[in-house]
């Protein structure tokens, strides 16, 4: 499949249409699977419910959560999508509210050579459109073949700094334990925190694993209804969605890490590997990359599950 990209939003005319409205704006010319249902599913975005008496406005629209998502697709491909609520449609100040922008990069699994979170805040994914682009009676041009250009926020150094804050390292180890149980328990990780923190929690979990294993763990930084999500790790907001902290904690169907309401599912981390990760993220990140090489060169461990502990025991 190589690399492809596709943009969906409100426009006067999309590349394949003569009508206006919410539609595919454009894609690269070689993207043959652009009409596949799983590609269309990437465009989905549910705006949060507003508090009673609050009307949508340009200012309120700017506060809506962004959904930065990574997903495994069929035919051995993966996608990274940025869904951004724009507010009004292509008509600008005269338009109606309800418009969002969805920009996806789709790539062969083997060609995706960076950690997905590293695309966060990348110039490769658009979060806005120019008025002249979408309010244009002529069909847009094809998009270029995309590049996997890293953003400026997520990298090992920034995650190490993040885990040094307060008791973040301890919370990370609980999240990791939960992530390694997913294959057996099928319980998602639900993270309620400030938007800039959610993606860092996810990146910390991904960096724990060798790249090709991390790429098997899908996520989203915002999910309106985690119960229906295709993601193993879901970021949520504390109000305005189907997520309810007390209900999720009491039902115990998922591992909840709610930093806004200070409510957490209790997870035991009594394991010698956690001491190793504590040291790796505190003093010696190179030791973690050495462990990754050992896994790939000396073990058969290739999926994110609790056999990760056994791989560490062999390494140790």
Name each model feature, range by range.
Residues 1-316:
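N-terminal module detector in large eukaryotic regulators
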